Swiss-Prot record:
Name of this protein: Transcription termination/antitermination protein NusG
Alphabetized HAMAP family for the sequence: NusG
Organism annotation: Staphylococcus epidermidis (strain ATCC 35984 / DSM 28319 / BCRC 17069 / CCUG 31568 / BM 3577 / RP62A)
Pfam families reported for this sequence: KOW, NusG
Gene Ontology annotations for the cellular component aspect, listed alphabetically: cytosol
Length: 182
């Protein structure tokens, strides 16, 4: 599987059971204090509201969908991996195959399903672009490159941009929030 460097993805993080809220708070504080807001974006505890009827009274409870897990939206770099991995209460990333190895991201369909169940939405970005328009890539390995939009995949929030590399036009896949229309 070819993982695009610099792409924003969702990862599952394993925590001590019952520490999900603490991990979320700790991680959000660490992101701010360590200036990681450009690499670590959202921390979500998968939970859903449940109504229980007890003694004839309806009571709403918030139940954790996946106890012991927190979802983190980030760009996987050595720094972001280190910050999350070393947050108090975190035992590790789900999907990493051993010491020091980087984890696999969650599939976009899985994330959409979980967020939809919670009543949240994946960030939607309204970009009015057409094939052939000029854009500037703002982040990632091709930051500050100017290119021409070749293909738009609205359902995946991605587009293919032709950039000039070493005198040749090269297609580069980027996310909507990584570009700026010229």
């Amino acid at each position: 599987m070819s993982e695009e460097v610099g792409a924003k993805r969702w990862y599952a993080v394993h925590t001590y059971s019952g520490y999900e809220n603490k991990v979320k708070k700790n991680l959000e504080k660490r992101v701010e204090s360590m200036n990681m807001t450009e690499q670590i974006f959202r921390v979500v505890i998968p939970e859903e509201e449940e109504t229980q009827v007890k003694d004839g009274k309806a009571k709403k409870l918030v139940k954790k969908t996946f106890p012991g897990y927190v979802l983190v939206e980030l760009i996987m770099t050595d720094e972001s991996w280190y910050v999350v991995r070393n947050t108090p209460g975190v035992t590790g990333f789900v999907g990493s195959a051993g010491a020091g190895s980087k984890p696999n991201p969650l599939l976009p369909e899985e994330v959409r399903f979980i967020l939809k169940q919670m009543g949240l939405k994946e960030k939607t970005i309204d970009v009015e672009l057409d094939v052939g328009e000029q854009v500037r890539i703002q982040s990632g390995p091709f930051a500050n490159q100017i290119g021409e939009v070749q293909e738009i995949e609205a359902d995946k929030f991605k587009l293919t941009v032709l950039v000039d590399m070493f005198g040749r036009e090269t297609p580069v896949e980027v996310e909507f929030d990584q570009i700026e229309k010229l």
